[in-house]
From Swiss-Prot:
Primary role: Aspartyl-tRNA synthetase with relaxed tRNA specificity since it is able to aspartylate not only its cognate tRNA(Asp) but also tRNA(Asn). Reaction proceeds in two steps: L-aspartate is first activated by ATP to form Asp-AMP and then transferred to the acceptor end of tRNA(Asp/Asn).
Enzymatic class: ligase
InterPro entries listed in its UniProt record: Aa-tRNA-synt_II, aa-tRNA-synth_II, aa-tRNA-synth_II/BPL/LPL, Asp-tRNA-ligase_1, Asp-tRNA-ligase_1_N, Asp/Asn-tRNA-synth_IIb, AspRS_core, GAD-like_sf
EC numbers: 6.1.1.23
Compartments in which it is found: Cytoplasm
Region (Aspartate): 196-199
Site entry (Important for tRNA non-discrimination), positions: 30, 81
Annotated protein name in UniProt: Aspartate--tRNA(Asp/Asn) ligase
Gene Ontology MF annotations: aspartate-tRNA ligase activity; aspartate-tRNA(Asn) ligase activity; ATP binding; nucleic acid binding
Coiled-coil segments on the chain, per record: none
Assembly: Homodimer.
Keywords: Aminoacyl-tRNA synthetase, ATP-binding, Cytoplasm, Ligase, Nucleotide-binding, Protein biosynthesis
Length: 596
């Protein structure tokens, strides 16, 4: 139906007859001559319909925005002075000899050339939103990423293997999406949160090197960087250690950025332990473009009279720290109050601060409600440790280490963004030596920091049961500009070690056998040492194209309420379907009457 895409139209084709297909982006009637900007996936071309081409002119006169057209004509140079330097085809135009209206369009609910469009409207009419060049660019960039990744891993000897989408429910840290079985009433499949167990079984099977670009599903509360279904670049290999896994993944990411953006990332990527990241930045995914760091003050505050600081410093897992903001003394009280409210989101019960107006005037050079509660010697040491200078402000956190880290760590990011402190464009970093376990105060038990199949570091094997809080994992995350883009670990390949980890998590032998019996059985048959990692494709593409959320790089995303505005999913189903599945709805569930 066509001879060229719009981006294939250029001066070298002047005088030739070409046929284009696409959508009418804009129609203009200039004194009897009609101009149409024809758009396809690749670009725009200006169509000119002259009155002497009667049929073509009549069709152009009838044409409206987003009509689907086939246009045949002779390419010619635009008249001098009418060229458009902002279009690749801006020096030429197509003189229409024939215009065929392939389909008509109702007026669209929003102008496709506008940028400020309500997201709900965009998601409801996603098929129109995707016509916009910006969205087409993002989907093409996503394709470019997956094509590069497949080529890299293929060349590295990895084999693409699909794993099941219908599997059994296993605890992996988030709620499963359950699928009831019609043939086995009362039983359920689960949609996989990751291919974790199956890729380990592929290593037991001797596949040696596996990868997959696959959908994963998690029924969890959503944020800007989460979706109930998301895509993962999943990688696993046998006979590897941490260095080998990172040594495979790092060149892939470095090559990807060079291929897609023409950017040279550092070689090698810097590394940082989890402990160091939390101590310096308060988070395990630090944005290293941000020059701000936390300063440790816990030891200083154990003997002060200021109760808020002293009690936090004396508690077993307490912390007192400060965040120095250069030039922050200019912040208004309203801005400080806004930051106080921001840290409250993370559990902080207040945000103490000191403005440093002058360093050579002792306490007189400091402005703060808390200065009078702290000895001059302590204040002097705070200024020394933090490297404070005149014109700075110090923000303080005093509570459990968890609350202080989350509050000041996130405040660090917020302040840097507000004040334009970010330096550089791309700053990757590997975070290593994660704790094996986190303590869940609500459930009063240890939980896996990553997942229960992560191997502990060798020196902690014997003390897992007695001292789980100090055990470190053979785990690693890759962080880019404050975003965790990938993570993985060396896996447990010996049943005795797996049983120790289950025991530390409070998973007894019977429960382990019930939930993971197939994995434990596989470990009997010569499982090789193995490990891997996974990258979040959606988040990676979001960063590469500068989008604000991963919803902007997924063709048909869900909302933050896990719904689809386009299809209105999730939806209700017929009573007959529920009866076949042996499901009865509670009264009031789903907005209807439960089936009999």
């Amino acid at each position: 139906m066509r001879t060229h895409y719009c981006n294939g139209i250029h001066e070298g084709l002047i005088g030739q007859t070409v046929t284009l297909c696409g959508w009418a982006q804009r129609r203009r009637d200039h004194g009897g001559v009609i101009f149409i900007d024809l758009r396809d996936r690749e670009g725009l071309v200006q169509i000119v319909a002259d009155p002497d081409q009667v049929d073509a002119f009549a069709a152009a006169n009838e044409c409206r925005s987003e009509f689907v057209l086939q246009v045949e004509g002779v390419l010619r140079a635009r008249p001098a002075g009418t060229e458009n330097p902002h279009m690749p085809s801006g020096k030429v135009e197509l003189a229409a000899a024939r215009i065929r209206i392939l389909n008509r369009s109702e007026p669209v609910p929003f102008p496709l050339d506008e940028e400020d469009i309500a997201e709900n409207l965009r998601l409801k009419y996603r098929y129109l939103d995707l016509r916009r060049p910006e969205m087409l660019h993002r989907l093409r960039l996503r394709h470019q990423v997956t094509r590069f990744v497949r080529g890299y891993l293929d060349n590295a000897g990895f084999i693409d293997v699909e794993t099941p989408v219908l599997t059994r429910s296993t605890p992996e840290g988030a709620r499963d999406y359950l699928v009831p079985s019609r043939t086995q009433p009362g039983h359920f499949f689960a949609l996989p949160q990751s291919p974790q167990l199956f890729k380990q079984l592929l290593m037991v099977a001797g596949l040696d090197r596996y990868y997959q670009i696959t959908k994963c599903f998690r029924d969890e509360d959503l944020r800007a960087d989460r979706q109930p279904e998301f895509t993962q670049i999943d990688i696993e290999a046998s006979f590897v250690d941490e260095e080998a896994v990172m040594g495979t993944a790092e060149p892939m990411i470095r090559g990807l950025f060079a291929e897609v953006l023409g950017v040279q990332l550092p070689d090698p990527f810097p590394r940082m332990t989890y402990r160091d990241a939390m101590h310096r930045f308060g988070v395990d995914r630090p944005d290293l473009r941000n020059p701000l760091e936390l300063t440790e003050l816990t030891d200083l505050m154990r003997a002060v009279d200021f109760k808020v600081f002293r009690e936090a410093a004396e508690r077993p897992h307490g912390r007192v720290a400060c965040l120095r903001v250069p030039g922050g003394a200019q912040l208004s009280r309203a801005q400080i109050d806004a930051y106080t409210q921001f840290t409250a989101i993370y559990g902080a019960r207040g945000l103490a601060w000191i403005k440093v107006n002058a360093l050579d005037q002792g306490n007189e050079g400091l402005q703060s409600p808390i200065v009078k509660f702290l000895p001059e010697m302590v204040l002097s040491e705070i200024l020394r440790r933090s490297g404070a200078a005149a014109g700075d402000i110090l923000f303080f956190g005093a509570d459990t280490a968890k609350i202080v880290n989350e509050a000041l760590g996130n405040l660090r990011n917020r302040v840097a963004a507000d004040l334009g402190l970010l330096e550089g464009e791309w700053c990757p970093v590997w975070i290593t030596d994660f704790p094996m376990f986190d303590y869940d105060d609500k459930e009063d038990r240890w939980t896996s920091t990553h997942h229960p199949f992560t191997a502990p570091q060798t020196e902690h094997l014997e003390t897992l049961g007695q001292d789980p809080g100090n055990a470190l994992a053979r785990a690693y995350d890759l962080v880019l500009n404050g975003n965790e883009i990938g993570g993985g670990s060396i896996r447990i390949h010996q049943e005795a070690v797996q049983e120790k980890v289950f025991a530390a998590l409070g998973i007894g032998a019977e429960e382990a056998r019930d939930k993971f019996g197939f994995l434990l059985d596989a470990l009997h048959y010569g499982a090789p040492p193995h490990g891997g990692l996974a990258f979040g494709l959606d988040r990676l593409v979001m960063l590469l194209c500068g989008a604000e959320t991963i919803r902007d790089v997924i063709a048909f995303p869900k909302t933050q309420k896990a719904g689809c505005l386009l299809t209105e999913a999730p939806g209700t189903v017929a009573d007959k379907q529920l009866q076949e599945l042996g499901i009865r709805l509670r009264p009031g569930v789903g907005g209807g009457v439960p089936n009999p």
